[in-house]
Amino acid sequence: MSQRDYYEVLGVSRDAADDEIKRAYRKKAMEFHPDRNPDNPEAEAKFKEAAEAYDVLRDAEKRARYDRFGHAGVNGNGYGGGGGFSSTEDIFAHFGDIFGDLFGFAGMGGARGPRPQAGSDLRYNLNISFRQAARGDEVTLRIPKNVTCPDCSGSGAAPGTQPETCPQCGGSGQVVRQQGFFQMAMPCSACRGEGRIVRNPCPRCRGAGQVQDIRELSVRIPAGVDTGNRLRLRGEGEPGVHGGPPGDLYVVIRVDDDKTFRRQGQDLVVRKEISFVQAILGDKVEVPTLDDPVTVDIPRGTQSGEVFRIAGKGLPHLGSSQTGALLVEVTVRIPSSVNDEQEKLLREFERLEENRPLRKVKNMFKKAGKAMGMD
């Protein structure tokens, strides 16, 4: 075949990403596949040409040589006008993963048997206390999960025996069905696509190759986690099948509410009730933190609902050395009733409220505070 530019063959730009090149090749392979174009030498030539182009452009090293030197840079790989594949069967064998996924045709690299399958992911819902979330903790989880059967090592066959190759599909897990011009590969009904048959099942797992077990895992809870955060433990999910990798375990966090603190992002909110005398005259009050209590200055004239911010007394930011703040939300307590002496002082304050020196008003509230037992 003529040596056209490989990018032109696949219809992609020279800066095309790998997945774009793969998609373009799939499209060309579908268009010029021999089963779709029987007795068509031109389509077969284009099919081989697309395969040749894809074999170079999918490989980073080959692609770099081609970009620099053109066809001369990759002719040592067997290309050079005649194509790198002597037959369509060679192409099927070389790119069996693509054709198996895309077309389902038989004759793509021989009997490969069942493919490895990754194990399923697991989810574990973990409730932790507010303090555990704030400070971090190490907890032990008991996870019910399937594990590879220790008696048969996952084969499903009784100890001392081995699974047999399926006689119907020859171990490929597929059988061929002719549909018009197409040969479609279907899962073998005799072995259910496994490519093998267990004549003598393992007594322990009953041929499943897996048994259920309780696995204890030690998990570190980072400080600052919140409800909905997920911790991913790689490889701690269900075991893979046919040599596939295990799945992952996702620990989903739920943080219990706290009686003292309310969370606002990485800040903590705490309510502090003060008397109306403290609000007017100002005072020093003690408020709780996650550590020891701290003293907060309440300035004169503080209104109910005002918030005072104490930096560094909140929750740590995940993955950072920064820490949130403690937000002290003040609530001014108003007495529901007063005695005669208190009412007298309040009436006197009402008369003196305007156009009186502040010192006299301050003394008035000191008297009111003593009368109400707030000294």
Curated annotation (Swiss-Prot):
Ligand binding (Zn(2+) 1): 149, 152, 202, 205
Annotated keywords: Chaperone, Cytoplasm, DNA replication, Metal-binding, Repeat, Stress response, Zinc, Zinc-finger
Cofactor note: Binds 2 Zn(2+) ions per monomer.
ZnF endpoints (CR-type): 136-214
GO terms (BP aspect): chaperone cofactor-dependent protein refolding; DNA replication; protein refolding; response to heat
Domain J: from-to ranges: 5-70
NCBIfam families with a match to the protein in the record: DnaJ_bact, PRK10767.1, PRK14301.1
Protein name stated in the entry: Chaperone protein DnaJ
Organism, as annotated: Oleidesulfovibrio alaskensis (strain ATCC BAA-1058 / DSM 17464 / G20) (Desulfovibrio alaskensis)
UniProt gene name: dnaJ
